[in-house]
Amino acid sequence: MSMKKLFMFLSLFVVCIVLVACGVEEKTEIHLLKEMPKPKAMTIDSSLSKKEATEMVHAAQRFYAFWDTGKENLIPHTVTENFFDNTLPKGRPQGTEGLKVAAQNFRKVVPNIHCEIEDLLVVGDKVTARLSFTGTHNDKKINFFAIDMLHVKDGKITEDWHLEDNLTLKQQLGLIAEE
């Protein structure tokens, strides 16, 4: 065996070991829902079955389609009846009513709000998303980010945690001075 062939064989062997060690498998090829926000980047835990991973990604897509459109008919297909918001802002109702109130209030301030999924990380029974929101308020551009963690069971979101860049949003809305 020539040195060149030996080197190629060893290189291929090392690549195969790395791929196996990283858990790269075909089952991470998830068919995304049409006409729903699509993640720009997605990482899926290789220990999940394709069915589990697909259900979790689809739940996230429907959830962010709700935030993107405000269509309340998505809620029953997206979250459980006893959905719980772990980072509920003061004054907002808990559960599915809280989601509706938040979206309605948001759309009063930024009627053309648009939600994009920048990154989606699917691990165990949780989905973590890095999101960007854009729109306009009184002809002024709005652009801020958020991070969500969703607990998914049987294809529906049971609870969430979220953190929005409220400083940037409030500055862009003119509620506080920009530095």
Residues covered by each model-derived region:
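Hydrophobic pocket/interface hotspot
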Residues: A60-F63, L74-P76, F83, G95, ...
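Bacterial N-terminal signal peptides
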Residues: L10-V18
